[in-house]
């Protein structure tokens, strides 16, 4: 086990290159199961979730080669077999294997998914979609069993706007007989990315990126080459870090339209931002940041994944800010850790109330989930003294080469192995 140390107070300068989108990659890789020949995915981030998916595809018989961000998958030899809880449990997005395997093999057995613990993140909308397409879904001994004689297109209305359910139903429907219509579909850029891959493989999909997606089932899908979109959440995290400690930071390989809600809020705080087609320039040196209120919403609203890093930045603002998370109410475990660093904030229901400016001090803190880890990294960059962050298994699931990228910008960041005594203290905490 390791900890990440950050000696705070260094100004950030330079260029950071953004990796491929994690939330896209974890759906694109299962989608390759649906093809009958080789699929090449370019620009994948080097994170633990991708390595787990690579191993899972190999377990069901796929030939998978992954290096330097390029994954080549030959799905032809794959067979339908139960996927055990072990690896599946490490991965929230393992549920995409359900839609892909159901689509190709008409059956699947998947251990219940793991990932970050963010309160109720049920998969009932996924199951509703699979059942509408003609599958029988049962939960037996902690695994989901899916079986279908054949899949037939259907009209499916999602009761809750869900990225996971929208993508999973798309995966199951592209090879189904007839037309599928997904109503109240999610509109995230990652959904458009998955639809682009499936279309390149021969699927017939219209309306991805709107709230109604129409799919005409086809007989088979073939291989192709696909380049992933940049990670808007990684880009947003670096933008927030640059707003907190930046002099001049260029965010490279980014689609600014994917981050309009964040750009608007940072400008409201007084941060200077310049955009071009694939880059965002953050210009620092603001004497004072203004407080803002923000509410997370489904895309194109403010992303729940950037709510936590944003709370760190708001400790610098001169006044009171209110952050409300309408997506995941349990996403405030980072508040106690920030208070340990000297932040003045409290949680009331689904909102965090932050009073600033509150200078942060380095402390020993623990990341409870992926984006809480990002929030503590931003706080560590701002704090006086050294911050020690544990729970790095969460950070490594979502941020590719984090220390290298921060070091290149001028931060003082390094990893250390935990001592036996520190491991014992962690396990008892």
UniProtKB/Swiss-Prot annotation:
Domain of life (superkingdom): Bacteria
Pfam (any one): EPSP_synthase
Localization (cell): Cytoplasm
Binding residues for phosphoenolpyruvate: 22-23
Pathway: Cell wall biogenesis; peptidoglycan biosynthesis
Active-site residues per Swiss-Prot or TrEMBL entry: 116 (proton donor)
Listed EC numbers: 2.5.1.7
Alphabetic keyword roster: Cell cycle, Cell division, Cell shape, Cell wall biogenesis/degradation, Cytoplasm, Peptidoglycan synthesis, Pyruvate, Transferase
GO cellular component, one term: cytoplasm
Residues that, per the record, bind UDP-N-acetyl-alpha-D-glucosamine: 92, 121-125, 305, 327
Keyword set includes Mitochondrion: no
Modified residues annotated as 2-(S-cysteinyl)pyruvic acid O-phosphothioketal in this record: 116
Catalysis performed (reactions): phosphoenolpyruvate + UDP-N-acetyl-alpha-D-glucosamine = UDP-N-acetyl-3-O-(1-carboxyvinyl)-alpha-D-glucosamine + phosphate
GO biological process: cell division; cell wall organization; peptidoglycan biosynthetic process; regulation of cell shape; UDP-N-acetylgalactosamine biosynthetic process
This protein's record includes keyword Transferase: yes
MF-aspect GO terms: UDP-N-acetylglucosamine 1-carboxyvinyltransferase activity
Function in brief: Cell wall formation. Adds enolpyruvyl to UDP-N-acetylglucosamine.
PANTHER family per record: UDP-N-ACETYLGLUCOSAMINE 1-CARBOXYVINYLTRANSFERASE, UDP-N-ACETYLGLUCOSAMINE 1-CARBOXYVINYLTRANSFERASE 2
Family: Belongs to the EPSP synthase family. MurA subfamily.
UniProt-recorded name of the protein: UDP-N-acetylglucosamine 1-carboxyvinyltransferase 2
Species name: Bacillus licheniformis (strain ATCC 14580 / DSM 13 / JCM 2505 / CCUG 7422 / NBRC 12200 / NCIMB 9375 / NCTC 10341 / NRRL NRS-1264 / Gibson 46)
